[in-house]
Structures are given as C-alpha cells and as structure tokens.
Amino acid sequence: MRKGSVKEVLAKIKYDPREKEEDYYVVIEHRGAYGGEKKIPVELIELGHGYFFVGEAQIPYHRILRVVRKDGKVIWETKKL
C-alpha cells in the first residue's frame, strides 16, 4: 500500500497517462471538519515542494492522512504511531 512519499504517489496519479486523477481523493487532517477529516479530489490539487495547493489554500503534505481511489481502495496511508 505505502510505496514512496505521498508527493510521489500524487505525482504519479496526476502525471501518469494511465491514471485518471478524477478517480482519486486525499483525506487530510482538518480541525474544523466533522470528524477532523476532509476529502479533497486530486483533480483540484496542484503540487508544490513542501505543500500542495487547492485554489488559494496552501496545505502541507504532512496533513494528508490517506490517498484513496473512489472504489474505496487506500493507495497510500500515513504511518501509524
């Protein structure tokens, strides 16, 4: 499941022509959201160096908890403590 950094996984989804970015979303830690988590479709994400961007919002990669395919399969998940 966890192969490489979350940025590498997202780059593969976004730039590999065999993948469809609309088939994936990320789950981030979000203090204001119900349950403390928020889903963001990968197609709305722009990748940066230490952060990714959703519109004007700059979000650090360490806030990503999971990358999930729309069929429910977890592609990448943060390490459990």
From Swiss-Prot:
Pfam families: MJ1316. InterPro entries: MJ1316, UPF0248. Belongs to the UPF0248 family. This is UPF0248 protein TK0315. It comes from Thermococcus kodakarensis (strain ATCC BAA-918 / JCM 12380 / KOD1) (Pyrococcus kodakaraensis (strain KOD1)).
